[in-house]
Amino acid sequence: MEWTRTGIFITLLVVVCACTQKNKTVTDAEPDRPEAFANDDELLDYIQKTHFNYMWEGAEKTSGLACERIHLDNVYPQQDQDVITIGGSGFGIAGLLVAIERNFINREEGVARLTKIVDYLAKADRFHGVWPHWLHGPTGKVKPFGTKDDGGDLVESSFLMQSLLCVRQYVKDGNEKEKALAAKIDELWHGMEFDWYRNGDQNVLYWHWSPN
């Protein structure tokens, strides 16, 4: 009798596993990805365009900034599809400048996106001028990185500001819209209270600070 029960259990387990595999959908991340490239320049173009598209087509809709993650199956067990990465957005913003130079987008399109980003950052949560590690895209409110990490992240914000300063230099002598963008970046830059993150007169910079 015991063997019969064991056999039935194994049979049911196999059936369940088979059904699960049958219903599972595997999404090809890049169905049109070329299998070979004619030369190194073509490969480099492909890599740069793919990197750029994460920030361009894959950006969080409200902010224009980089998502912490993109799941191609659109399944987010932690409901974090709207989470923005501040440091990663810095890398993406630098990529937008490359995209303009490489004519992946025109300058006007790039400036419009960058202005949207900067306007969003000016309204989003900051802690003595410093952004948190993560933001909730639709609201601009802090998304805690950990139990005691719900405030400013100086390292991630520095990655972000490095790229914004590159943007500032790129547009500061341009047309009126570009000069206005550079001025907005200046305000954000000068608003970062690096001295606060020294915790007094200590000869250090604190990575994180939370009001809690």
Predicted regions and their residues:
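Long, well-ordered core segments of solenoidal/helical folds
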Residues: 48-64, 112-129, 183-203
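Well-ordered alpha-helical scaffold segments within catalytic/enzyme domains
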Residues: 30-43, 53-54, 90-105, 120, ...
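Bacterial signal peptide processing site
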Residues: 20-22
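Extended ligand-binding clefts on enzyme/binding-domain cores
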Residues: 41-44, 129-158, 173-212
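Bacterial N-terminal signal peptides that target proteins for export
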Residues: 1-8
